């Protein structure tokens, strides 16, 4: 079956799933949420409200930004969340300068007013694309550390937490060491299940290091495939990739029975991870930020031995890409209902 045929044949399934939710046939997944990047095609189509969409899908949590419009807008969003019985995670970046501290505190106060379970920050880009030298990477990492130092007293004052995402900027060992060094109950990890594969980490090792520090999960399955300069990395519907989704979820729930798993099923072309290029290795240093050869070998073994068809939008119109996005999200939610206790 071609991708286009798959998109067309899923239309009736999507309609059934939507109607089932709207008629109350399925219970709310109180510990499963949605994040904006997973709805990118729907957002581009216009008229998108992430709270309404997550509610319609039967998700009990949503990641939002602080609304524009001041206190009235914040109160309006809180009222909507309360009406739907939903919780929220609020994206607020730590202050990069002393001059930004006051605005950051205003945003943290708004997050508290919204009843945020935690705030969220993904402050890095893909390090192998962003930086050409190790020195530039180190300067950036030290600046991010300083920004969280500025943020922590404000978080403590308002009793609001910050979950720092592993966003292809730091390997798990350095990320975990940093969070432990901060030593604050208000600073932890937003654990993205897939991102560190791009930094040549076995998902089991990422889990071992980040799970004990996790405040919430950016939830997805993943798959890999070879290409001439390295490997391709793609988000997949839950249960259709290479990750041990049931095992990872169970382990995190043993640590926190109310752990939130916010779905981020991004429907796009696979990412290119160019591990066979000189630029990829420019930011790794043997002592400050090591990437041992055995880790590269392990990831390449995973690439060689796992055969999964990757998510792709190549050749799809915007309308068909949106249909594929809806299908992948709905398949993920159906999997969670059947196999996970969320």
Give a label for each model feature.
Residues 7-16, 26-31, 45-52, 172-186, ...:
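Histidine-acidic metal/acid-base catalytic patches
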Residues 16-21, 61, 82-88, 96-188:
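Active-site acidic/histidine proton-transfer and metal-coordination neighborhood
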Residues 40-44, 64-74, 94-102, 129, ...:
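Acidic-and-aromatic substrate-binding clefts and catalytic sites of carbohydrate-active enzymes
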Residues 35-57, 61:
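N-terminal targeting signals for Sec/Tat export/insertion, comprising classic cleavable signal peptides
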Residues 44, 121, 127-130, 225-229:
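Short acidic/His/Gly/Ser-rich catalytic and metal-binding motifs that mark active-site loops
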Residues 1-5:
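Twin-arginine (Tat) signal peptide motif
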Residues 30-37, 62-64, 88-92, 119-121, ...:
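Hydrophobic faces of well-ordered beta-strands that scaffold small-molecule active sites
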Residues 26-27, 51-56, 70-89, 105-116, ...:
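Acidic (Asp/Glu)-rich catalytic clusters
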